[in-house]
Amino acid sequence: MADDLRAGGVLEPIAMVPPRPDLAAEKEPASWKEGLFLDADPCSDQGYHANPGATVKTLIPEGKTPFPRIIQTNELLFYERFRAYQDYILADCKASEVKEFTVSFLEKVLEPSGWWAVWHTNVFEVLVEVTNVDFPSLKAVVRLAEPCIYESKLSTFTLANVKELLDLKEFHLPLQELWVVSDDSHEFHQMALAIEHVRFFYKHIWRSWDEEEEDEYDYFVRCVEPRLRLYYDILEDRVPSGLIVDYHNLLSQCEESYRKFLNLRSSLSNCNSDSEQENISMVEGLNLYSEIEQLKQKLKLIENPLLRYVFGYQKNSNIQGKGTRQNGQKVIHVVSSTMKTGLLRSLFKDRFCEESCKEETEIKFHSDLLSGINACYDGDTVIICPGHYVVHGTCSIADSIELEGYGLPDDIVIEKRGKGDTFVDCTGMDVKISGIKFIQHDSVEGILIIHHGKTTLENCVLQCETTGVTVRTSAELFMKNSDVYGAKGAGIEIYPGSKCTLTDNGIHHCKEGILIKDFLDEHYDIPKISMINNVIHNNEGYGVVLVKPTIFCDLQENTQDEINDNMVQKNKEADVTEGLDLEEMLQCVASKMEPYATADFNEQAKGNCEIINELLAISMQKGRMKKRLSELGITQADDNIMSQEMFIEIMGNQFKWNGKGSFGTFLY
C-alpha cells in the first residue's frame, strides 16, 4: 500500500527524529530538536538537498477502502538520513554492533504499545494495533484492529488468509512492514521516522555479509556513507544506467553466492567424517569464498564515488554497423535546418565542384541531424551546414563515416538536451569529425566516447559538463587543433590498451586535464600516448594524472638506486644495457626539450619533464619486473609486454595555472 499511499494526501506539520540521549549529552548542550532544525550540515554534499530539516508528512490514502491517515516518511533527503545514521543510530559502531545500536535507538524512541499501523505487503494491506514491541528481533506484536480495515490486490486472498498468516507468524511482524498511523496530536511522527530509518537501512544499506567483514573501524564510514551516497546519486541521475544495472546484478550474484556459501559451511560444520565428499565440499567452499570476495570488491568499486569516477564504467556498445551498401555506392548527406539558395550555391561551389569531375555521387538532404547520421553506411559523408542543432538522444556512429562542419566550429553547434547517459558514441573503424562545436547538458557520461576503432577529431570545440573525451580499451583517438573545456571530470580519459595522439589542442577549465588509467591489469596493455604542442591550463587539479596501484609506487622508490647500480656493476651485462638504454632515452628526450627550456626552467619544460620522469620510472619498473621473471625462468611470453612504453612522444606541451601542478598520480 505504501506505493499507493504516496500518490497524494493532506500535509501535516513536521516532526523530527530524537537523538540518542547519551550522544546528545556529549555533543550538543541544546535540545535535540534545536540540533536537527539547523539549516546546514557540514557532512552533506551541496547538490544533495534543497531545504534543511528532516520533515515528515501525513496523507489520506486514495483507494476503495477508507484507511486512516498514515505518516509519510519516504521522501527524506540525503543529509537527513546521513545525520540520523551518523549522529543518532549507528555513530561509530562496528558491523558486529549494528543490531545492538539499532535496538538501543529504537528503545528510546518507540512506544512499546498503544499505536496503530498499516501492515503492508505486496499482496494486501491491513490495519493492526501494536500491543508490544520485541526490540531484540526488531518485531512488533500486533492484533487486527477493531473495526478491521483490510484491502487485497488479489481477490483470492481473503481476510481469513490474513488471519491464518498472522497465526503462523505468532502475531510478530517486522517493524519494516509497518506504516505508522497518525493522530491529531502528531505524537507518533517521531516513531514513524525512526521506523523509516530502520526500514531504509535494511533495504538499501545492510548486506548479509557485512558482519563477516573487517571490524576494526566504524561501519558508518566504511559502508553506510558510500552506499547512501550511491543511492542518492542513482536517484538524481548521476550514475550511468548501465552501471546501475551492473551494480544490481553484482549484488544479486553476491547474495546468491553468499547464501550457497552459508549453506555449504553449515553442512560442513554438521559433518564430522573425513570423506571424499567433504573434501570436495571444502574445495567448492573455497571457490565460493573467492568468488564472493571478487564480487564484493567490484561492489565497493561502484559504491565509492572517487573510485567510481577514476575507474569509470566500461559500457559494451551493442550498436552494429551497417557496413557498405550492396552496390558499393557512397552517399553525401547534407544536414541543414533550412536550406536557402545562397547556401546551396556556396555549398556546391566549395564542396561539389571537384566531385563533379569524378563519377556521379548521390546527395541526400536532411533537416534532422540524427536522421542524417542514422542513414549512413560505411564511407558516407555528412556535411552539416551552419546552424544550431538540438538533439535529445545519443549520436551513435557505428560505421566508418566522416562528419564535417561546413564553416567555423562556432557556426555549427550541436547541443545535447534532455537526460541521458552519452552524447556521441563512436564504434566505427574509422570515424572522422571536423569543424563542429558540441555542447553537453545533463549527460551522465562523457561528451564523446570512443568504444572501438579510430576516431579523428580535428578543429572541433567540446563544451563539456561531465567528462570530455573518453578513449576506451582497444580504441584510438587522434585529436588535433581542438578545444576541450568545462568538464567536471577529466577533459580526456585514456583507458588501458588504447592509443591516443594529441596535437595542438587546448584542454582547460576541467577538474583534471588528462586522466590516464594505467591499472597494470593483467588483461590489458598499457595505453600508448603521444602529446605534442598541447596547452593544458586552468584545470582544477593536475594537468595530467596517472592512475596506478600502490605496489607500482613501491617498485618505483628505488628507481634511482637501480640506475646507479646498473652503471657501477659493469660486470653484469644485462644491467649495464638496461642502464644505458635509460640514459640514452633521457638524453634523447632532453635534446628534444632543449629549445623549450629557459634559464629558470619554466613551467612548460617542467611539465614535460615530470611526464618524462614517469616514463623512465615505468621503463625501469618493467625492467625490474622482467629481471625478476627471468630469474623464475619466465622470459618468452613477457618480452612483448615489457617492451611497450606508455608515452611514445612528449614534447612542446605547455602546462599553465593548473591547481595542483602539471603532473600527478592517483594511488589505489
Curated annotation (Swiss-Prot):
**Record's InterPro entries?**
Beta_helix, PbH1, Pectin_lyas_fold, Pectin_lyase_fold/virulence, SHCBP1-like
- What domain of life does the native source organism fall in? Eukaryota
- PTM-bearing positions, type N-acetylalanine: 2
Q: What induces it?
A: Down-regulated upon growth inhibition.
Q: Where in the cell is it found?
A: Midbody; Cytoplasm, Cytoskeleton, Spindle
What does the tissue specificity note say? Expressed in spleen, lung and heart with higher expression in testis. No expression in brain, liver and skeletal muscle. Elevated expression in actively cycling cells.
Q: Name one GO cellular component term.
A: cytoplasm
SMART domains named in the record: PbH1
PbH1 repeats (start-end): 428-451, 452-473, 474-496, 497-518, 526-548
| Gene3D superfamilies noted in UniProt | Single-stranded right-handed beta-helix, Pectin lyase-like
Name a Pfam family for this protein: Beta_helix
What is the protein's major site of localization?
Answer: other
In Gene Ontology terms, what is one molecular function of this protein? SH2 domain binding
Q: Which residues carry this modification: Phosphoserine?
A: 31, 44, 273, 630
Record's keyword terms, sorted:
Acetylation, Cytoplasm, Cytoskeleton, Phosphoprotein, Repeat
Q: Name one GO biological process term.
A: fibroblast growth factor receptor signaling pathway
- Described purpose of this protein according to its UniProt entry: May play a role in signaling pathways governing cellular proliferation, cell growth and differentiation. May be a component of a novel signaling pathway downstream of Shc. Acts as a positive regulator of FGF signaling in neural progenitor cells.
Q: How does it assemble?
A: Interacts directly with isoform p52shc of SHC1 via its SH2 domain. Interacts with TRIM71; leading to enhanced SHCBP1 protein stability. Interacts with both members of the centralspindlin complex, KIF23 and RACGAP1.
Q: What is this protein called?
A: SHC SH2 domain-binding protein 1
The taxonomy runs: Eukaryota, Metazoa, Chordata, Craniata, Vertebrata
